[in-house]
Amino acid sequence: MASRCKIHLTVAYLLILCILASAQSKQMTTETVVLNVTALSEINQTKYNVQINLNIGLLDNDIFINGAPLKPSGVTRMTCPALLLDGYNVSSGNSVDGLVSCELRLMVNQSYVQSDAAEQLLFLVLSQEIIQLADEKVQQPEISEVEIMWNQSSEQMTQVTSIYPSARSKLSIIPRENDVLVTDASVQSAVEDQVRNTTSHYLLKNSETTQEEIAAPGKLPETPLRMDPETLYESREEEERRSDSLLLEPPLSGSMSSYSVACQWVEKLRDKLRRFLSDSVPLFFLVMWVVVVGVAGSAVVIKILDLIFPSCEHRGFFHLNPETLMPDDEKVSLIDNMEGDMTEKSILLIEK
């Protein structure tokens, strides 16, 4: 009995180790892309030399830019820091050590190619365009395009950067009204890390009274402790100001809705079906082509053999006599049999 329990514990321990190993193996592969681009101001045609650092991550064929997910074949607009290389400050004047915020339009095209060693490689094409530096609208005369080749077996990535006029870019043709806006990922993570309250905001100096609250004796949890009205606020004006700000404050972000979860599930299902059909449909047509060619080829070969080596006899065919409705061969055999019987009878009569 004890040995059986030890065996069960060992099997359970091995299963846990396998699960942990598989969970740790699924790590995001990242690659840093440094882009040096030139932007022109739409107001006074000031030229800015800008350097942008983008962290591209790959996890389960999903693409992430600076921690934000990107949809293939779609334009995503996001904000990220940029470095001014020429020392000029933008019109807003709020740059710190040459760092300013810039608004980018990004488009990623994803496809699969096969290397010379018969390995399947993931091929990514990233197009980039700056439309705003700080508070100033800018234009980018030359579009940067980064080609990334990712080897899924060795987890190695190679990148090649190309620059060409914006008129030849597909990114500039797509209207900006269809862009998908992505907020800063760091802000989203900071908001999600906050403790979500289950009660409303109370008019206290520390309005978030439900965070890490310890219930007082005789009080229920998540209930504001009783305080004297004189100690709540330092002045009447402060009370009114805090009440107005709390009423206008937006609620904290909650968890994802069921609709967004369903949309993500349908999107993943669509990608899996697309990959399945792209792999199975060519194989199906190849099999059908082999079947059609085989049937047609066998028919042609049989016809040629019939022409070269014709058969002398056609077995299985009877030629009927229209008068007797009997085959000619059968008629001849019957006549022969009748003549034989008549000769035998005549011989017997003579002998008698």
From Swiss-Prot:
Task: List all topological domains (Cytoplasmic).
Answer: 303-352
The superkingdom listed in its UniProt entry is Eukaryota
Extracellular topological segments: 26-281
- The glycosylation sites annotated in the UniProt record are N36, N44, N89, N109, N151, N197
UniProtKB keywords: Glycoprotein, Membrane, Signal, Transmembrane, Transmembrane helix
Its signal peptide is: 1-25
Question: Topology in the membrane?
Answer: Single-pass membrane protein
**Disordered, as annotated region:** 206-245
- GO CC annotations? membrane
Q: Which residues cross the membrane?
A: 282-302
In terms of InterPro entries, this protein maps to: GINM1 (IPR042319)
Q: Where in the cell is it found?
A: Membrane
Decide whether keyword Glycoprotein is in the record: yes
Question: Which portions of the chain have biased composition (kind: Basic and acidic residues)?
Answer: 225-244
Entry protein name: Glycoprotein integral membrane protein 1
Q: Which organism is it from?
A: Danio rerio
